[in-house]
Swiss-Prot record:
The keyword Ligase does not apply. The complex is composed of two ATP-binding proteins (ModC), two transmembrane proteins (ModB) and a solute-binding protein (ModA). This is Molybdenum import ATP-binding protein ModC. InterPro entries: AAA+_ATPase, ABC_transporter-like_ATP-bd, ABC_transporter-like_CS, Mo/tungstate-bd_C_term_dom, ModC_ABC_ATP-bd, Molybdenum_import_ModC, Mop_domain, P-loop_NTPase. The gene is modC. Keywords: ATP-binding, Cell inner membrane, Cell membrane, Membrane, Molybdenum, Nucleotide-binding, Translocase, Transport. It comes from Hahella chejuensis (strain KCTC 2396).
């Protein structure tokens, strides 16, 4: 049984050419990431069958949706599509919107129950309301719920938070976090926001001028020095950790990572729970030995993988091995020379701030 998704498309329209080929896991969230105009939405529409490329091939696990002699039309593809602007039926209630596609799916093909979606997205207080009375974040939650209730084998999300204000984005992100952990449906998530991608995705396809520049597990691509992600102002790495203890006196949670322990703001969760952390490159400084006295309490042993010149020529981005994972440190070239830090050296990373992703 094939559990992967494979896609390839070629299209030349006007002055834009899309020429992509990639494989992704058939589970979890794959982010289609790139700057505006890189081809993200065009690619998503080819996957949905809403547009047809001159050449294309698409296989979702064991199902072929497109090949040289086959094109499954959009209404025959078991997929859900969430757009930037939620397209809800204004004359129907929230509940009727949710059930619109669900009622058209044969019972034996229904893989998601309305009660589950209502619980995951906390829609119970809204189900009797008219959609026109909802906030932007509420409308998008309903649109996501409606897409899920079509029992899709693939969920496509085209910048679902792009039209929301900051408060609405912060409102909906926790629901997406929870949803993606509960779902057994692969998701293609289009975004040009590094924050969204790092928080939600496990896999990444990086698009640039209509081509796939790179693809793979998100942390591998976030920390690759030949890719722009490692040189962004908000460059960071995603690290896996385990809850080791809760320090109630200081309202902190202690997280076990390879070689040490990191203290973060208190997080609810049982001992042994796996979590993900986001560590910004700008929040990691380097030392040759642990400082005896410092306000930065998080200090862990790491090994220098390589040192790369940053976009800002006075700085470098240092890749550091933390066990089998990689984190980044953005420091000045002067400090690297003063400490004589070289590739392969064992040093200590002082981590000023750590953000919990989940």
């Amino acid at each position: 049984m094939n559990d992967d998704i494979s896609a390839s498309f070629f299209s030349h329209r006007g002055d834009f050419t899309l020429d992509v080929a990639f494989h992704t896991p058939g589970q979890g969230v794959t982010a289609l990431f790139g700057r505006s105009g890189s081809g993200k939405t065009t690619l998503l529409r080819f996957i949905a069958g809403l547009e047809r490329a001159e050449k294309g091939a698409l296989q979702i696990k064991d199902e072929v949706w497109q090949s040289a002699d086959l094109f499954v039309p959009p209404h025959r593809r078991a997929l859900g599509y969430v757009f930037q602007e939620p397209s809800l039926f204004a004359h129907l209630s929230v509940m009727d919107n949710l059930l619109y596609g669900h009622q058209r799916i044969p019972q034996w093909e229904r893989r998601v129950a309305p009660e589950e979606v209502i619980r995951w997205l906390e829609l119970e207080p809204l189900i009797g309301r008219n959609t026109q009375s909802l906030s932007g974040g509420q409308r998008q939650r309903v649109a996501i719920g409606r897409a899920l209730l079509t029992s899709p084998k693939l969920l496509l999300m085209d910048e679902p938070l792009a039209s929301l204000d900051l408060q609405s984005k912060e409102e909906i992100l926790p629901y997406l976090d929870e949803l993606f952990q509960q779902l057994d449906i692969p998701v293609f998530y289009v975004s040009h926001s590094p924050d969204e991608v790092m928080r939600l995705a496990s896999h990444l396809v990086l698009l640039d001028h209509g081509c796939v520049r790179a693809g793979g597990p998100i942390n591998e691509l976030l920390t690759r020095p030949d890719l722009p992600l490692a040189h962004l102002e908000e460059a960071s790495a995603v690290v896996h950790a385990t809850i080791q203890a809760h320090d109630l006196e200081y309202h902190q949670t202690l997280l076990s990572v390879p070689g040490g322990v990191l203290a973060v703001h208190h997080k609810q969760g049982p001992i042994g729970q796996q979590v993900r952390l986001r560590i910004h490159a700008k929040d990691v400084s380097l030392a040759l030995k642990p400082p005896e006295l410092s306000s930065i309490s998080n200090c862990i042993p790491v090994k220098v993988i390589d040192i790369n010149v940053d976009r800002e020529p006075s700085q470098v981005v240092v890749r550091l091995a933390l066990g089998e994972e990689t984190i980044l440190s953005r420091v000045t070239r002067r400090s690297i020379d003063q400490l004589n830090i070289e590739r392969g050296m064992s040093v200590f990373a002082q981590v000023k701030s750590v953000a919990l992703i989940d």
